[in-house]
């Protein structure tokens, strides 16, 4: 009797199992779309002007901007010996005229050249306008370019010369950063995805936490290559004052920042050539003390077309 009952139970379990399998087979699996996941959609679109779209880029296939802020003008006759002739440099009043200091300036030029040579997709920009002490003879940026050429581009691949340019209007740290980005746009018709700045290491915090922040660039996209200065203590004191000034006045449009502020009244033309920053230029015209709250062409979620 118990054997027959066990057999009936076993047959019942089998029947239930087959019924369950049949029900599962009738459930249709969702169709596969075979589509890759969608990329993040830009929330804001900024458009190039018709004039901007017609301009042929001077350089292509580039994405990194290497900036060397130019600090002085070399007035000597032999640019190849610029590091040896401190007396032939038109230095600002608060700069030391020692040989060690001018060697540091030439070192910055060389580092910039070597950094650009390491990356074939990099553009090197020497940035700096005219100096009061040098008069209207030459811009600081042009002087740096001449030193690099006279030193045969410091022995690196000569092709780096075709990717080296000047930005000849900047007069303070914020302008070095912003105007060099604008110069990159003029050359490549797009904005850089990475920025490398060469300077004294005591200035690193100002560039990272003040200047880039004021123009909406992510710190993670910036590399700062800093060197020691022969007048380290003196430079650190001046730098602390500069940081305090830019913290109060992020765009450096007031005299308390201490820059030369366009001494020859030669206004930069970037507001007319980089029209995708139109709203930002308008904001700067009011000489604001607060950071711009709008979006930039390089802001996350923005597409420039």
Please place each PLM-identified region on the residue numbering.
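A structural signal for short, hydrophobic/glycine-enriched beta-strand patches
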Residues: 2, 27-247, 251-252, 292, ...
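N-terminal signal-anchor transmembrane helix specifying type II single-pass membrane topology
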Residues: 2-32
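Short linear motifs in intrinsically disordered/low-complexity regions
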Residues: 12, 35-36, 263
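Generic recognition of cysteine residues
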Residues: 21-24, 182, 253, 287
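A structured, mid-to-C-terminal "fold-capping" secondary-structure block
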Residues: 227-305
């Amino acid at each position: 009797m118990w054997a027959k009952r066990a057999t009936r139970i076993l047959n019942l379990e089998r029947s239930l199992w087959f019924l369950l399998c049949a029900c599962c087979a009738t459930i249709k699996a969702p169709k596969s779309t075979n589509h890759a996941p969608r990329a993040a959609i830009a929330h804001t679109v900024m458009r190039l002007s018709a004039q901007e779209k017609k301009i042929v880029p001077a350089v292509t296939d580039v994405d990194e901007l290497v900036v060397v802020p130019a600090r002085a003008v070399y007035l000597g006759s032999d640019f190849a010996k610029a590091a040896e002739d401190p007396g032939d440099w038109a230095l600002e009043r608060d700069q030391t005229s020692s040989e060690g200091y001018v060697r540091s300036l030439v070192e910055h030029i060389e580092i910039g050249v070597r950094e650009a040579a390491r990356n074939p997709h990099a553009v090197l920009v020497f940035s700096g306008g005219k100096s009061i002490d040098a008069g209207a003879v030459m811009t600081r940026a042009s002087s740096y370019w001449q030193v690099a050429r006279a030193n045969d581009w410091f022995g690196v691949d000569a092709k780096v010369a075709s990717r080296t340019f000047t930005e000849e209007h900047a007069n303070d740290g914020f302008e070095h950063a912003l105007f060099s980005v604008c110069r990159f746009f003029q050359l490549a018709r797009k904005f850089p995805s990475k920025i490398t700045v060469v300077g004294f290491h005591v200035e690193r915090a100002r560039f990272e936490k003040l200047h880039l922040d004021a123009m909406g660039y992510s710190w993670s996209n910036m590399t700062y290559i800093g060197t020691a200065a022969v007048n380290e203590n003196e430079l650190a004191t001046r730098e602390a004052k500069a940081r305090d000034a830019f913290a109060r006045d992020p765009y450096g449009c007031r005299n308390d920042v201490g820059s030369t502020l366009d001494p020859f009244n030669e206004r930069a033309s970037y507001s007319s050539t980089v029209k995708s920053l139109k709203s930002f230029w308008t904001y700067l015209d009011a000489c604001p003390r607060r950071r711009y709250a709008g979006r930039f062409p390089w802001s996350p979620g923005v597409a420039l077309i």
